[in-house]
A protein has these predicted regions:
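Eukaryote-specific, low-hydrophobicity, charge-rich regions
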Residues: 72-126, 130
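Hydrophobic beta-strand-centered segment that forms part of the acyl-chain substrate-binding groove
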Residues: 21-28, 156-188
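Alpha-helix N-cap/helix-initiation motif
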Residues: 141-142, 146, 180
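Active-site helix/loop of acyl-thioester processing domains in fatty-acid/polyketide metabolism
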Residues: 9, 122-126, 144-167
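Catalytic strand-loop segment that frames the active site of acyl-thioester-processing enzymes
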Residues: 32-47, 107-143
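HotDog/MaoC-like acyl-thioester-processing domains
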Residues: 2-96, 181-183, 194-227
Length: 227
């Protein structure tokens, strides 16, 4: 597999304002429940990482299983039916949902133990995300599973659509893999709007590592009228 150099735009222009695309902030004013949720998710990620590259013996794994079963029993009474604060149709989406929705998002939420640790920023009219993948996301030896690569494109492309306030449900997502996405190296995702139509937005993006093009993607997002 070849590894062509990235021909696309480089880092953001000097002086260009940068802000988070989604309402996910850190700091001393973070609500106590959110801080505790993130701490619990971080601990859960460590457990998942240990289980996806196991080196422990049966006795240790039995002890871990018993501890996790006890913790699951503690959390069980507090489960909700959905991560959304209020029920809504499956086809309903908002460009700027409640921050709690982003907090528990399966692809970027810091309180979701399976979400890759991606940080998505607004750089002008582009969405730029950086993420380092660990063993939890390994597919081929030393590389990220292609399904995870595609999932990250889904969230970075719709983040670009959010900047232009044309976010919607994913209609199509096409990914072209140019090189393996390595583990334990910073991966940069970029996306921008190419065209906006009556009810759809066409968005494209790329991922790179140290200037090497890893994959490219195009997506069509369908805007759904708010109820």
């Amino acid at each position: 597999m070849d590894t062509p150099s990235d021909p696309g735009p480089g880092p953001e222009r000097p002086g260009e304002p940068v802000e988070l695309v989604h309402d996910l902030h850190d700091g001393p004013d973070l609500p106590a429940a959110v801080a505790a949720s993130r701490r619990a998710a971080d601990a859960a990620r460590r457990v998942v990482a240990g289980l996806t590259a196991p080196g422990a013996d049966a006795a240790t794994l039995t002890e871990v299983a018993a501890a996790l079963e006890r913790l699951a029993d503690v959390l069980e009474p507090h489960r909700r039916g959905s991560r959304w604060p209020a029920p809504r149709p499956a086809t309903r989406t908002d460009a700027t949902p409640d921050p709690a929705v982003w907090e528990s998002h399966p692809l970027l939420g810091p309180s979701h133990p399976l979400a890759p640790p991606i940080r998505i920023e607004r750089h002008g009219d582009r969405a730029v995300g950086t993420v380092t993948f660990g063993h939890t996301y390994e597919g081929p030896p030393g590389a990220v599973h292609g399904g995870i690569v595609a999932a990250m494109f889904d969230i970075i492309l719709i983040s670009a659509a959010s900047i232009a306030e044309v976010a919607g449900l994913t209609g199509t997502l096409t990914v072209r893999y140019r090189a393996a996405t390595p583990l334990f190296r910073e991966i940069r995702y970029e996306a921008q709007i190419d065209e906006v139509r009556a009810r759809t937005a066409l968005v494209s993006g790329r991922s790179t590592a140290d200037g090497v093009l890893l994959a490219e993607a195009e997506g069509i997002f369908v805007r759904v009228p708010r109820a």
